[in-house]
């Protein structure tokens, strides 16, 4: 895919900077949750009013028809916040949306440091696009270090997890149709990268979740 085939939002994610800073982000304050993002999510799920169902197809529990949301076959008057693939929710009515996925490979080194920065991005001449070294995120001092390489590939239906939306004009036109369809259901809210078909970082994901909660409160 050529650069002109995708939206400027994607190209803008790879800025060219002349600087002595080794970080990717330019925010004045940058941090991670003390116990990590996984524990942050686990802490949310431990709330007594949250019931978690694993290995469950949401589309077998939720049905949409003529502006009415059904849960387990009965009309549901509460609010449904959907964060999955929006085209799956509507049975691919307007076609599938394109995504890129990743294959991850980790390697352990018997030395405290492997690369100069926590994350190093690579151009198209490499099979992998990014290498992360985890001890540099947490500033841990260890005798060994672990890196992870990311290999991008096309996300096909039933194979690979959808990580990156591909915002071509065709895909955005399809998504607009799904968005308009979702708007017909007053108690249905779309949230997150898959449901909104947009690339968002973790901080923005958390912020948008809080903003939606405030709107509903």
Predicted regions and their residues:
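Active-site/ligand-binding neighborhood in enzyme catalytic cores
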Residues: 1-78
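Hydrophobic/aromatic-lined pockets within catalytic cores
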Residues: 2-3, 45, 49, 82-85, ...
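Conserved beta-strand termini and adjacent loop/short-helix elements that scaffold enzyme active sites
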Residues: 53-57, 134, 191
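Mid-domain catalytic core of redox enzymes
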Residues: 62-181
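Surface-exposed flexible segments
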Residues: 9-17, 94, 201-212
């Amino acid at each position: 895919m050529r650069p002109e085939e995708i939206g400027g939002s994607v190209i803008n994610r790879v800025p060219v900077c002349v600087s002595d800073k080794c970080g990717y982000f330019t925010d004045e304050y940058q941090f991670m949750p003390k116990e990590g993002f996984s524990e942050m999510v686990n802490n949310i799920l431990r709330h007594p009013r949250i019931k978690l169902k694993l290995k469950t197809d949401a589309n077998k529990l939720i049905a949409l028809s003529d502006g009415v949301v059904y849960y387990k076959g009965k009309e549901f008057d509460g609010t449904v916040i959907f964060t999955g693939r929006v085209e799956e929710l509507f049975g691919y009515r307007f076609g599938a949306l394109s995504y890129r996925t990743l294959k991850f490979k980790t390697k352990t080194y018997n030395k405290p440091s492997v690369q100069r920065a926590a994350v190093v991005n690579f151009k198209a001449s490499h099979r992998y696009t990014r290498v992360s070294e985890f001890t540099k995120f947490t500033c841990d001092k260890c005798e060994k270090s672990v890196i992870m390489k990311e290999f991008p590939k096309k996300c096909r239906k039933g194979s690979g997890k959808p990580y990156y939306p591909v915002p071509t004009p065709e895909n955005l036109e399809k998504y607009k149709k799904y968005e308009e369809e979702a708007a017909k259901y007053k108690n249905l809210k779309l949230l997150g990268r898959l449901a909104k078909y947009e690339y968002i970082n973790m901080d923005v994901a958390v912020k948008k979740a809080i903003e939606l909660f405030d709107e509903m409160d």
